[in-house]
Amino acid sequence: IRRTPGGRGTDGWVFKDLKVGDQVKIAGPYGRFFFRTARENAAIMIGGGTGLAPLKSMVRHVLETGTGQTMYLYHGVRGAADLYDVEFFRGLAAEHPDQFFYRPCLSEEDGVEGTSHGLVTDVVMGDFPTLRGMVAYLCGPPPMVEASLKMLMRKRLFPRDTYREDFFDSSDKATGGVRSPLIRTS
């Protein structure tokens, strides 16, 4: 868990009251950010930081239920220390080579084996001449989600085929967060 200065959840509870070994009850999820298995389109999935977590759940669901959609998962972080579940995703990619593709992207660190260097949006831009006919799932910090939306539009993937989940912290809320008039929020 990353501490957010002034955050109600981290400063006001996790780092203030909890100790290693404490048990917590978690409920949910209650949102509308889920994989649409009725859509047979290939999916481009872009997660920033901890935005990878819901995408991991989607990937597992699709592979376990055998619905058959092809998935391209990109995980954007600053450096290799911010990556997680790398071996898990590499294992899935090896096990499902025609259905699942995984690409970790480091924006501030270069030369790390098995990763791409650059902003996750730039890496996706370079990998696909067009994204027409696909669906997109975006999850992470609002600036990354907004940059991804713009990139998807340039690559011919439009709002009706895009699902998103923004992670807001207390600093985002103080400024009103980041919202796009181009897309529905899941």
Predicted segments, located by residue:
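Phosphate- and divalent-cation-binding pockets in alpha/beta enzyme and binding domains
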Residues: 34, 54-57, 147-148
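Short, compositionally biased
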Residues: 36-49
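Reductase modules of NAD(P)H-dependent flavoproteins
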Residues: 70-186
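Histidine-anchored nucleotide/phosphate-binding helix
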Residues: 56-64
